[in-house]
Amino acid sequence: MNESNLTRRTLLAAAAAVPLASVAAASENIPAHPKDTNMSSRTFTKTAAPDWLLAFWREIDDKTWGRGFDCFKEDAIANLGVSDWHGRQAIRENLRAFVDKGFTAHHEVVEYWDGGSLKVFRGFVTMKPNDPTQKTVRPAMTHFFYMDEKDPSKVAHWYGSVGPVAF
């Protein structure tokens, strides 16, 4: 890349791409390089968000941390941003520690796509800090839920991105 093409956008895009290769390589034998990936097609249907997803977000929004987490299989994996949490209870405990330490959240579903064993969600989360001197933010979210092969009603692996919350 020559100097005249280096913009803030290309710099941010390049910086954002760096950790993706290592996350992909560490996740369920997913190849780090596209040339190593077997390509396939999948049909998605845009539909209303299912009850399990709404119940999960409600547990976080209400800070109740209960049955909404039952959408995850017992040994589910979550990679939310830089997290690497293993097990339903670890997912619950780590989200609780993150949210309870400083803000109240409200999740808003904008669109939900059902692709069978892969569910895709896009929306926003309003994050209101407990400290009134801090500003409320509303970052975008995108989440991929890979459902369990044996029990397709349970999430086996969750990949999610939220933010950035500030620049």
Regions found by a protein language model. Name each.
Residues 30-43, 79, 92-167:
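A beta-strand edge to alpha-helix "cap/lid" segment located at domain peripheries
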Residues 15-66, 70-71:
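Short, low-complexity N-terminal intrinsically disordered segments enriched in polar/charged residues
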Residues 10, 48, 52, 90:
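Charged catalytic carboxylate motif
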Residues 2-18:
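N-terminal secretory signal peptides and thylakoid transit peptides that target proteins
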Residues 85-93:
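Short beta-edge strand/loop motif at the mouth of beta-sheet-based domains
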